[in-house]
Each structure stands twice: as structure tokens, then as C-alpha cells.
């Protein structure tokens, strides 16, 4: 008589009573049953899980008779699954043999609470709903707390941050001293001596070797998980779209782990920033050094150009590269780049600071590893120079190029201070990209059209980038304001990067602007941070209010 095991069946499959470590997706195949030779061989997929026995109802007459085939008689594990389980056993053995964390390490880890109000991207004079965020941080030298930028979210007057020590119920007020959204890091200051009592700063270590065991610390009530280092490479940070060095680990990342330290041997080897990914210590040290040296908001250099690999021998021959030469081909150099008008399209970059670049766009790194060449540039600060060796028309040249800051894929005003804006004719002009906040050159775009008869028919200009005002190339938002305020022609003409044109009657647009401000309860045509020469004088001097520039008037009245 056939013995039918007692199992908990879910659908066509049941749960196997095997160790959780062996849980994995695999393929199994039924074999001829000892009770009947009529069963065919069928291949299907299943999952070994923690409870019960895996069984499969036969698709033939045995199924009609309700016969269940035990796992031992009907399934064979494939070789790949066995090897995978052996790797898992080795992994867990390595993790179990690792040393527990020192209690002093845990005492240096804190909980971070942040509440921030963002400004509207399209209407920068308006604030949006308050957002709350929680994460982890840890003490570093100088009575500072290091955490993720996305945990504190912003660095402005509308951001409020509290921290709480491990095992304590008291929250302490913190101030964001420095934030870098490029590398997703922020430094907090806490003035309370009580908070720092008995807290030791954690020491920063080096990049961990592959397959080394690391501990991830953070989350609610200090959760500790362990895993192995899988790879070290440059990677696009999702938060900022910056291409920087990163470490991938297989340790479980729990809720609110962001900003927590990754520990190896009681030293910090990284900061958690995404699920499975860690900011390595070279990036952390570079960020901290930049904080001490400068108040710049960007601390990573960039050549700001487009390029491609040269792995195909035909393209290398076309550009007269010798057999031993390797490098990358420049496709485009952006006008904001320090290499603009120095390097050229179709130049071959052979080396940076004496380090040869491979045809695969990579350079040598630690322990025979290779990473993207951008690492050489990003680990320099904006304003520093890089020695770039290029091949041009078969001849080699070297240039010292001043690096520009990395430009993340977001508008700076959202994160740092009260947004900059200027309104004219119902069009809202804002900075387009993140550079230095005091940069002499940045792009300007239209973020919103406040509907009015004066701007009817110009709906397609939303998001358009301004190139010229009355034939003069626009340098930045302040320059655009000056060009519009000082307009002496009957018509104001704006030209855009997409080749579209905006023409407004200047006097009519000025009158319409004041009406638009009152209609939308906007206090000013211009943000406070943009200081035009015409606004520096006392507007009530000699009571000559009628001689004031027209745009000063909204600054005197509160329409709310």
C-alpha cells in the first residue's frame, strides 16, 4: 500500500520540510514511479521552502486516483542548485565565525528624525506639505554626526532635525552643517554637551576586500545584520544621478537603515544609502575634507563631456591609434565644462594624471580590479586641475584642465535655500541646474506660466531654456533680471534653446505682471536672494516713489 505523507498543499505544490538555507528556485523532474510505469516524465518548476514536503499531483491517471508522489521518489536536485547551496553554507559559516560588534560601536549610532517643507518646483514662492523622514547616523571626529542627505532631505530654514541616542528616549536638536546630494551625505551638529557625554567617534577604515564580512547597523532599536562584500565599482546614485564609487553587499538592509554605518573590525567601511549598496570611505573622506576646506555645495569634480569606448579595432585605426594606445573618444564637450574650447570633439583621451584609460573606459583599481575612469576625476574637487593626455589627428597633447562640479539631476533650489525666481509677463523664471550657488553661469528656464491675456498662446514655452534676451546671451537668473529690467525697446524678445521665440510688448507686460501678482497673492516679482543694483537704494529717498523701478512696487506691499 502506498504511504501518503501528511502535507500542507497549496495549489499544485506543497511546502517542503527542509532547512531554510536550502530554499531556492530549482527545476525538478518526475521519474517513473515504483507503483506504476504509466507515468510520463514531466519537467516543471517549483520552490523548496521551509515546511512540509514538496509533492506534485501527477497529470496522468495517478492524479485521477489522488496519488501523491513523495519528493524523494519524484524529484532530483540539479547540480547548479547543489553548488548554490554549498556557497550559501560557506557564506553562513563565514558570517557565524565573524566577531560580534563592540558595544562602544553601538553607543556611537544614533536615530535621526527629520521634518522638512519643500518649495514648489513650478511655483517657488509656495511651500508644499511637510515631509517626515527617519534614518540612522553615527558619530565622527569633531563632535559631528554623519548620515544620508536623503534622510535630512534639505538644508534650509524649513528643515528641522532631531537625533536620539541608542537606548535613550531624549531627542536633541540638530543642525545641518553641510550636505552633499551628489554623494548622499550630510553632517549634523548638536550643541548639547549631555548628548556627547560618553560617546566615542567611529574611525573610518579602508575599502573592504571582496567576500569580507561586514555588519550593517541602524534602524529602530539598533538592528544588526551581516553580509559579504560582493563588488566595488562606480555606480549611478539613484538619489542624485551622480556616477560615484559604490560597494555592493548582500546583508539585509532594514527600514530606517539609511545613513547607518557599515562596520568591519570596529571601523566604518561605508554608509548605507540604498538597498544592498554602501557609500565607501574614499567618498566619505572626500566629503568631510571638502566640508573643512570650503562651503561649496559641490565637492566632486567633473569633465562634463560625453564619450564612448574604443573596443572596436576599426574605429581605433580610423583615429590613427597605435597598437599599444588605449583610450576613449570624445563625442561632445558641454559649454559649462572646463575643457570647453580646450579639448575637441573626436579627441582621444589617452590618460588622466598619468593613469592610462582602457578602451573599455576603465582604469586599474585595487587588487587587480578595474573601475570606470570617471573615478579619477570625481575624486578631485571643483577648481582642481587634471592633466589630460589626448590624441588629436595622430599627435599627442597634454592639457591642465580645471574641473567643474558634478551636476546632479535636480534643481538646487529644492534642497538648499529659499528658491530663486523672477516673474515677468506671467512667466516664472528659475535656475535650471545645480552648480555653485554663487556661480556666474547657470541655465535659466520657464517653470510656470501664470495665465493672462498678455501670455496667451505661449503655452508651449513651459520648461523652455532661455538663451537670449534682446539678442544678449543670458548668463544666469540675475543677469536675465537685469536684461529685462533695463529693456529700452518697445518689444521684449526672448530666444530659447529649442529655437522658439517669445515677444511681449514691454510696457503692457509690466502692467500685466503687477495684476498677475495681485491675482495670485504673490508678494514679489523677485526672490530675496537676487540683489539688483536698482533695489539697493532706499526706495523712499526724497519721496520719489514715482521714479522707482516698476518691479520694486510689489516688494512694498503684502497681497496676502
From Swiss-Prot:
GO terms for biological process: proteolysis. The active site is at 150 (charge relay system), 184 (charge relay system), 258 (charge relay system). Belongs to the peptidase S1C family. Disulfide bonds: none annotated. Its main location: mitochondrion. Gene3D superfamilies: 2.30.42.10, 2.40.10.120, 3.20.190.20. Residues 288-384 form the PDZ domain. One of its GO terms (cellular component) is mitochondrial membrane. It comes from Arabidopsis thaliana. It is found in: Mitochondrion membrane. It comes from the Eukaryota. This is Putative protease Do-like 11, mitochondrial. The keyword Transit peptide applies. Residues 117-302 are annotated as: Serine protease. The keyword Lipoprotein does not apply. Residues 1-65 form a transit peptide. Keywords: Hydrolase, Membrane, Mitochondrion, Protease, Serine protease, Transit peptide. InterPro entries: DEGP_PDZ, DEGP_PDZ_sf, PDZ, PDZ_sf, Peptidase_S1_PA, Peptidase_S1C. It holds the Pfam family PDZ_3. Putative serine protease.
Amino acid at each position: 500500500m502506498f504511504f501518503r505523507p501528511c502535507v500542507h498543499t497549496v495549489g499544485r505544490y506543497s511546502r517542503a520540510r527542509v532547512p531554510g538555507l536550502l530554499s531556492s528556485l530549482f527545476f525538478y523532474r518526475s521519474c517513473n514511479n515504483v507503483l506504476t510505469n504509466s507515468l510520463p516524465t514531466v519537467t516543471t518548476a517549483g520552490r523548496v521552502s521551509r515546511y512540509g514536503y514538496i509533492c506534485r499531483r501527477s497529470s496522468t491517471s495517478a492524479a485521477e486516483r489522488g496519488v501523491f508522489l513523495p519528493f524523494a521518489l519524484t524529484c532530483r536536485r540539479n547540480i547548479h542548485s547543489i553548488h548554490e547551496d554549498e556557497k550559501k553554507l560557506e557564506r553562513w559559516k563565514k558570517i557565524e565565525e565573524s566577531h560580534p560588534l563592540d558595544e562602544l560601536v553601538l553607543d556611537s549610532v544614533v536615530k535621526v528624525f527629520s521634518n522638512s517643507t519643500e518649495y514648489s518646483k513650478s511655483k517657488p514662492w509656495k511651500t508644499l506639505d511637510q515631509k517626515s523622514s527617519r534614518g540612522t547616523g553615527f558619530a565622527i571626529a569633531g563632535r559631528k554626526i554623519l548620515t544620508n542627505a536623503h534622510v535630512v532631505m534639505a538644508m534650509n530654514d524649513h528643515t528641522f532635525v532631531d537625533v536620539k541616542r541608542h537606548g535613550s528616549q531624549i531627542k536633541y536638536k540638530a543642525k545641518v552643517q553641510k550636505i552633499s546630494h551628489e554623494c548622499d551625505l550630510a553632517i549634523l551638529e548638536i550643541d548639547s554637551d549631555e548628548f556627547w557625554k560618553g560617546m566615542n567617534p567611529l574611525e573610518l577604515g579602508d575599502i573592504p576586500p571582496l567576500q569580507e564580512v561586514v555588519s550593517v547597523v541602524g534602524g529602530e532599536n539598533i538592528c544588526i545584520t551581516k553580509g559579504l562584500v560582493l563588488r566595488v565599482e562606480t555606480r549611478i546614485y539613484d538619489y542624485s544621478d551622480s556616477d560615484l564609487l559604490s560597494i555592493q553587499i548582500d546583508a539585509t538592509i532594514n527600514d530606517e537603515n539609511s545613513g547607518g554605518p557599515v562596520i568591519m573590525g570596529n571601523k566604518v567601511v561605508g554608509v548605507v544609502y540604498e538597498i544592498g549598496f554602501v557609500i565607501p570611505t574614499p567618498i566619505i573622506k572626500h566629503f568631510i575634507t571638502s566640508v573643512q576646506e570650503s562651503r561649496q555645495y559641490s565637492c566632486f569634480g567633473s569633465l562634463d563631456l560625453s564619450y564612448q569606448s574604443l573596443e572596436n579595432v576599426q574605429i581605433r585605426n580610423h583615429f590613427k591609434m597605435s597598437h599599444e594606445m588605449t583610450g576613449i573618444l570624445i563625442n561632445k564637450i558641454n559649454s559649462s565644462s572646463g575643457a570647453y574650447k580646450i579639448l575637441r570633439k573626436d579627441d582621444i583621451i589617452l590618460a588622466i594624471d598619468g593613469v592610462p584609460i582602457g578602451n573599455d573606459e576603465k582604469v586599474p583599481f585595487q587588487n587587480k580590479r578595474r573601475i570606470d575612469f570617471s573615478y579619477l576625476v570625481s575624486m578631485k574637487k571643483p577648481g582642481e586641475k587634471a592633466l589630460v593626455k589626448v590624441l588629436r589627428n595622430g599627435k599627442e597633447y597634454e592639457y591642465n584642465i580645471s574641473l567643474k562640479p558634478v551636476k546632479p539631476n535636480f534643481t538646487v533650489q529644492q534642497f538648499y535655500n529659499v528658491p530663486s525666481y523672477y516673474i515677468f509677463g506671467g512667466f516664472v523664471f528659475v535656475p535650471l541646474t545645480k552648480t555653485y550657488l554663487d556661480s556666474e553661469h547657470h541655465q535659466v528656464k520657464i517653470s510656470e506660466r501664470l495665465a493672462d491675456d498678455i501670455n496667451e498662446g505661449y503655452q508651449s514655452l513651459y520648461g523652455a531654456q532661455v538663451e537670449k534676451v534682446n539678442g544678449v546671451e543670458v548668463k544666469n537668473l540675475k543677469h536675465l533680471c537685469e536684461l529685462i529690467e533695463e529693456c529700452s525697446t518697445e518689444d521684449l524678445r526672448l530666444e530659447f534653446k529649442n529655437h522658439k521665440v517669445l515677444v511681449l510688448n514691454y510696457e503692457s507686460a509690466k502692467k500685466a505682471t503687477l495684476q498677475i501678482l495681485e491675482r495670485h497673492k504673490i508678494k514679489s516679482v523677485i526672490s530675496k536672494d537676487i540683489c539688483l543694483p536698482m533695489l539697493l537704494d532706499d526706495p523712499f529717498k526724497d519721496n520719489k516713489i514715482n521714479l522707482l523701478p516698476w518691479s520694486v512696487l510689489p516688494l512694498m506691499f503684502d497681497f496676502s
